[in-house]
Amino acid sequence: MALYIKHRPKDFTEIISNKGTVLSLEAELKKEDHSHSYLLIGPSGCGKTTIARIFANKLGCHEKSIIEIDAGSERGVETADNLRESILYTPIYGSIKVYIIDEIQATSAKFQEALLKTLEDTPKHIYFILCTTDPQKIKKTVKTRCSTYEVSALNNINIYKLLSKICKKENIQIQDDVLKEIAIVSEGCPRQALVILDQVILVEPSYRLKIVKSSKIEKEEIKKLIKLLLTNSNWKDVAKVLKGLKEDPEKIRMSILMYCNAILLNGKNDPKIALIMDYFKDPFYSAGKALLTLACYNIISE
């Protein structure tokens, strides 16, 4: 079993960092009249769905009545209509049912419109927990129906402590500098840190640090791609970088978008940055690498 699954927190006491969010959710649980719709906002892999599952359990939901929906692959109005129909039925296990909808920002406008009708008239035995990395893509009317909580990425120290703790539990012998490097390249994402740890423990100790640093090289290549797009480079150079990228196209899109957003917020007036953001504003779920390539080509051709 993968480490990130095996060591997924089962209780709020096991959550590292995000203490403010945990305390707020625990306070919500003490209320007599709970909200039936929640929105968790935070970067990919920071623990949103884990916190959602723990919260669902604390509400008194049976494990088999917690339903996770990946909005990245099921985002049409038909899915929303099916959802509206299924909530009418009482749960087979326990007295309540909780729907966790991950990547809600990837859903279509029609899905969100259909979901809104459900949120406006939710049965007493139904709860919704929506998770997103990009709240700007969620309809305001949907957001206002939810109690909103932010989940932050972990700092390097907390990631390192998590890795050390798990290595001790699993009796994994690994160099300290490797764990520190994993903490750096995982960029606050515990899931990513454990995925990398899973990979490196399978190889010879002398190669481990090199493998971890190769993950860092991928991020450097993404930065290189951004610079090429900003400096009107020729397509041949851009294509060369694109060919070497193995990262998920959607993650690359978000990295580019966040990088450009940071530049604009720092006060730089550059229409090219706005142009890049415009080409990368929509998700690449439907065609992946092909849409990434097309977006880059169109930017270079402008």
Where in the sequence are the language-model features?
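P-loop/Walker A NTP-binding region and its immediately flanking N-terminal helices
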Residues: 1-148, 152-158, 164, 176-177, ...
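Conserved GTPase G-domain signal focused on the G5
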Residues: 76, 190-191
